[in-house]
Structure formats: structure tokens, C-alpha cells
């Protein structure tokens, strides 16, 4: 089923369905799968020497990471399948051509509802569920901006370029959560390998491809297509590009912290430190 851009807004309430669905899925998977799996992974003699508080903290963090890996791995596979099927996906000049009357497939519509629902869920999970970290305020700001950006791209019909943006971002998160799981289970080689892939993907996708291809397309190449309209969508254009630049600021902030982690790893004979994301978790 193909959905014309202006008609897509009628499906937007599905985001709330997905948000509630993620709460339920996380609740049951935590209790039935993730925590039992974590307890099994920390059942070795060495793990049993930890005090109960430390062991429980590791189980909680392990459960968080495997939940995120499940999600990011699934949606990354989904978006890559969408990109493979869409003729416009690799041609940046097509991202805004024919706007606002572009058509989206039902799969792409559901993908957007899923992603927006997940980040809305993540805002509440960050407050009430997940381990509190030192970069809480930055992470909360990121989730809010991302939720708004996904919803905005969908409702305004900028969903083609938005799809590519989501594909770029989820790839890094897959490597990140895998590195965390390796670190929590003391698989140092795996942690170092996936942290390296995480850092490399962050640099290439979020700090090179995102600004020099995606933001360039959104702020410059888009004008070629949008000027064909009777009235240039000035407000929509500036709001969208402002949000993309805000996202880039988050990327630069976290890249600084990733570089600190790289230096820490080099000084630690190649072993990844406790927090492979941003050096923001409390030491355990």
C-alpha cells in the first residue's frame, strides 16, 4: 500500500501504540529473558565473588544493553531492507523531488511510527527505568530532539531524508551495545573490537556523512526541488535544518567523550573502560 505524504498524518497516533507496546515488551522481556540471561552470564565463580550490590548493578546494565541491542539491531535490519527497495534511497537529489506529494510504503510508515514511538518511550524510560548516568541531561535532550525530528520529518513529508538519517544513527548504536555486553561479561577482546567499530562508525556516519552529505542535501540541494513550488516552505525548511544542526552538536559533544575513552583505552593496554559510550557512568 502506498500512502501519499499529506495523508500520512492520519496514521500518526500509532506512535502512542508503539510507545505503550515498548513498555510492555521491555517489562516482560526483562523478567522472562534478559535478567535470567544476565544472571546466567554472571554465575561464574569470579562473578560470584562480587558483592550482591555490584552484581545486581551489572545485571541491570546488561539487561538494558541487550534490550537496546535487540531494538537497534532489528530496526537497522528493517531500514536497510527499506533502503534496498526504495529507488530514491541512494540519490540525494531525489530526497525532496516531488515534495509534498511523495508516496511512502506502508512498511516505511510503520517504521517511522515504530521509531518515533521508541524515542517517546525512551524519554520516560530514561527518567523512571534506566540507570542514571552523568550525561542524563544531554541524553534527555537528545531523546526529545530526536522524537520531535522523527515526528516532524514524517508529518511534513521530509521522510525520505529522514529515513537515511535514522539508518546512519542506528548503526553506531548496534556496535555500542554489543561492546557494552562484551565489557559487562569481561570479554575484553570483543569489547575492544566493537568499541573500535563503534568509534569508527560514529566518525564516518555521524561526523562526516551526516554533515557533509545529509545536512548539505537538506540545506542546499533541497532548494533546487523546493523552489519549483508556488511558495517556498521557508518555516518548514529552517525548522528542519535547525534540528539537524542541533543533532550534529550532540554528535560532536559525544565524539569528544569517545576520544577520551580511546585515550583511556590506549593507556589501559587496549582494554575498554567501564563506560564505552561517554565515560559518564559512575565507576563500579
From Swiss-Prot:
Its main location: endoplasmic reticulum. This is ASC1-like protein 3. GO terms for cellular component: endoplasmic reticulum; endoplasmic reticulum membrane; Golgi apparatus. It is a multi-pass membrane protein. Residues 60-267 form the TLC domain. Mediates resistance to sphinganine-analog mycotoxins (SAMs) by restoring the sphingolipid biosynthesis. Could salvage the transport of GPI-anchored proteins from the endoplasmic reticulum to the Golgi apparatus in ceramides-depleted cells after SAM exposure. The keyword Transmembrane applies. Disulfide bonds: none annotated. GO terms for biological process: ceramide biosynthetic process; long-chain fatty acid biosynthetic process; response to molecule of fungal origin. GO terms for molecular function: sphingosine N-acyltransferase activity. Coiled coil: none annotated. Keywords: Endoplasmic reticulum, Lipid biosynthesis, Lipid metabolism, Membrane, Transmembrane, Transmembrane helix. The chain crosses the membrane at residues 9-29, 69-89, 108-128, 148-168, 195-215, 243-263. It is found in: Endoplasmic reticulum membrane.
